[in-house]
């Protein structure tokens, strides 16, 4: 039997409309600018304050005090806060969990916020306080506001309205609830921070996000809330369960930070360690921090100890093997050049960027994370990890 052309087209059209439509996940892309600053970081205590932005539960007197001028990176994204929106830039950090902004009466090169000019501001309570590993801090009030980020608007987002701060810019912490500054205060409480609010308000389907720092010389990177982007990594994502410890190495009833198990490190074909330790994946830390014996082993192999640095140094032109970090069968390769940090511009001597954590865990900062694509799955208390692709 012959079909007319019009009848055939009608049948095909009906079939196409009847075909199932694949549901696309709701995601939100947040771009950030990479800022590199060479500035004197005075009195940095190596063992007790790894990194430049690590949230501290309590200060420690242990460690070597050094004066280090170090080019470090931080990741600025633009937000609007309040009604009408006040635009400012904040530093994105996976190692802490709170949004806070420089408030009325403070100053910052990257913008400040004045709650008296907002009709959506709601003060919750006083007592906002957060401190970091470099000795900097911010204090003020807890409040709720409307915040626009990446083209999306979130209402009633809890944040710190800082009335005093010496950090330089506000911070957008996107870590776990248990690491919120409010959970560590005398009047302890927790709240739904940005990733959870994005899901609660239907802006993304999953409380999860992917971090892509881009290459060492790149000027921008991105976070994809709610999903992952397979074009930015090689192979598949290895799934890692989070380890239930806090940043002092103490066991907890649930995950409070993005600790995973690092099973070993190789340099070229040589094994550095096959002992498994927890490792914190922290974009707010610049270097890599390792258990003391491992950090010393790497330092001695590739540098000479310098008391003025408080660490091992080598020529900035030095070459070495790729470092391979093993996680549940997945290997992340980090070029040796990513581990060298110049003291100041023009110096011929570089710090080998693997220092002692003073604890039985690693902190894997930007020196590692630039080589990795990391999917932070808050809903399932897991992390996915793969080799980043540039």
From Swiss-Prot:
**What domain of life does the native source organism fall in?**
Eukaryota
Record: active site: 93, 282
Tell me which stretches of the chain form a coiled coil. Answer: none
Q: List the keywords (alphabetical).
A: Aspartyl protease, Hydrolase, Protease, Signal
Q: Which CDD domains does UniProt cross-reference here?
A: SAP_like
What top-level class of enzyme does the UniProt entry assign? hydrolase
Record's signal peptide: 1-18
Quote the EC number.
3.4.23.-
Q: Which gene encodes it?
A: PEP1
* Listed name of the protein: Acid protease
Query: What does the entry give for GO biological process?
Result: proteolysis
Q: Pfam families of this UniProt entry?
A: Asp (PF00026)
> Could you tell me which residue ranges the Peptidase A1 domain spans?
75-386
- Do you know which PROSITE patterns this protein is assigned to? ASP_PROTEASE, PEPTIDASE_A1
């Amino acid at each position: 039997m012959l079909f007319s052309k019009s009848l055939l087209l009608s049948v095909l059209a009906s079939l196409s409309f009847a075909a199932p439509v694949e549901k696309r996940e709701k995601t939100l892309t947040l771009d950030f600018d990479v800022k590199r600053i060479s500035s004197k970081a005075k009195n940095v205590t190596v063992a007790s304050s790894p990194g430049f932005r690590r949230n501290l539960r309590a200060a420690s007197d242990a460690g070597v005090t050094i004066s280090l001028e170090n080019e470090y990176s931080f990741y600025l994204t633009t937000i609007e806060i309040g009604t009408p929106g006040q635009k400012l830039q904040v530093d994105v950090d996976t190692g802490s969990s709170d949004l806070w902004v420089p408030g009325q009466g403070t100053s910052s090169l990257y913008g400040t916020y004045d709650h008296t000019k907002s009709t959506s501001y709601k003060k919750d309570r006083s007592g906002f306080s957060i401190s970091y590993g470099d000795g900097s801090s911010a204090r003020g009030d807890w409040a709720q506001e409307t915040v626009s980020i990446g083209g999306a608007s979130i209402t009633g987002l809890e944040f710190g309205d800082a009335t005093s701060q010496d950090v330089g810019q506000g911070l957008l912490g996107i870590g776990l609830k248990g690491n919120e500054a409010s959970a560590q205060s005398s009047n302890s409480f927790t709240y739904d921070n940005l990733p959870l609010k994005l899901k609660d308000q239907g802006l993304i389907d999953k409380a999860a996000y992917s971090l892509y720092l881009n290459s060492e010389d790149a000027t921008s990177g991105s976070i994809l809330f709610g999903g992952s982007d397979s074009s930015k990594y090689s192979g598949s994502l290895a799934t890692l369960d989070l380890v239930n410890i806090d940043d002092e190495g103490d066991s907890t009833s649930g995950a409070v930070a993005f600790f995973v198990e690092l099973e070993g490190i190789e340099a070229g074909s040589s094994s550095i360690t096959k002992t498994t330790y927890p490792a914190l994946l922290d974009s707010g830390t610049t270097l890599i921090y390792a258990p003391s014996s491992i950090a010393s082993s790497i330092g001695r192999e590739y540098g000479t100890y310098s008391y003025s640095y408080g660490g091992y140094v080598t020529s900035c032109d030095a070459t070495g093997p790729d470092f391979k970090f093993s996680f549940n069968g997945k290997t992340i390769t980090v070029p040796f050049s990513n581990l060298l940090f110049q003291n100041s511009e023009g110096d011929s001597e570089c710090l080998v960027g693997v220092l002692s954590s003073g604890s039985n865990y690693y902190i894997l900062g930007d020196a590692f994370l630039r080589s990795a694509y990391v999917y932070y799955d808050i809903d399932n208390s897991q992390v996915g990890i793969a080799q980043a692709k540039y």
